[in-house]
Each structure stands twice: as C-alpha cells, then as structure tokens.
C-alpha cells in the first residue's frame, strides 16, 4: 500500500467510480439527495490550498481516499483545522491496515502544513470508532441531520 498527497482535480476521472461506490454504500436519503459533486468548488478550494487529498494505492490502482477541508478556526484563530469531507477505503482493502495507514499519512502531512486539529467524522450507521480511538482520537461531539426538502 502506498500513500500520497495528490490533486483531486488531477485524479477526478480515476476517483469518480470510488466516489460512486462510496455514495451507494453509505449515503442516506439517496432518493432525495443524488450524488453530484461540485467539481468547480473542489477546484477552487484546492487552488486556495484549502483542500487536501490523500490517496491509498496498490500497484498504482486507487483503492482509497481521504479528502479534507483546511481552514483557520473561526473561534480559534490561532489554530488551523482539517475537517473530513470524505474518507473511503474500497471494501476489499478494509481488513488490513489501509485505513490506519491512510489516516496516519494524512495526519503527518497535515502537521507539516501547520494543521493543529484533525477532525474525522464517521457515519453513525458505519462507524470506525475503534480505529480512531486506537489512534488517540477523542469523541468530541454528536451530529444530527434531518432532510427538510
């Protein structure tokens, strides 16, 4: 398994099938909320240095990604936060340490870039809490969602 930081814009065509698999596996309200990535906004955020994309590859094949939005804290201007947009490992690579390796690689790279807080959210119906807790992450808040139309 090889981990890299890559340009989301550059790998758009390659990542799209994984994003579709991820959406069909995990997304709620699929009848109402269709997958429709805003590639222009991703590109703008990336050009501003506010979007970081980390990838997992096996023999050059993309098998996972971890995409984060990086911003100064609105309440904590002395700190830079990296918040998960999406994180995904193809099912056939979840048994090993691919997820751990991808998160650890991203954490190291983000720290080099001056990020002081890494925030990873998980779906309540598909958590990976044990992995995060084993990596010294703490449960810090709960998130509720309601489709309102």
Language-model segments: which ranges?
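Conserved acetyl-CoA-binding loop-helix of GNAT-fold acetyltransferases
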Residues: 95-108
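A short helix-loop-beta-strand connector motif used in the catalytic cores of GNAT acetyltransferases and
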Residues: 43-55
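Conserved acetyl-CoA-binding loop of GNAT-fold acetyltransferases
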Residues: 132-142
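A short, internal acetyl-CoA/4′-phosphopantetheine-binding micro-motif in the GNAT/acyltransferase core
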Residues: 85-95
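A conserved beta-turn-beta hairpin within the catalytic core of GNAT-like acetyltransferases
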Residues: 72-84, 140
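Conserved beta-strand-loop-alpha-helix junction that forms the acyl-donor binding cleft
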Residues: 118-129, 148
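Conserved beta-strand in the GNAT
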Residues: 55, 61-70
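Short amphipathic alpha-helix that is part of the acyltransferase structural core
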Residues: 1-37
């Amino acid at each position: 398994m090889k981990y890299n930081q890559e340009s989301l814009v550059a790998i758009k065509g390659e990542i799209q099938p994984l994003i579709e698999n991820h959406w069909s596996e995990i997304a709620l309200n699929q009848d109402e909320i269709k997958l429709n990535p805003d590639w222009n906004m991703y590109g703008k955020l990336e050009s501003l240095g506010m979007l970081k994309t980390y990838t997992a590859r096996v023999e050059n094949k993309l098998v996972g990604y971890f995409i984060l939005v990086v911003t100064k804290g609105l309440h904590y201007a002395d700190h830079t936060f990296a918040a998960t947009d999406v994180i995904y490992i193809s099912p056939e690579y979840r048994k090993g340490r691919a997820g751990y390796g991808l998160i650890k690689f991203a954490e190291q790279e983000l720290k080099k870039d001056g990020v002081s807080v890494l925030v990873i959210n998980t779906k309540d119906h598909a958590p990976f809490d044990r992995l995060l807790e084993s990596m010294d992450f703490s449960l810090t808040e709960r998130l509720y969602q309601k489709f309102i139309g």
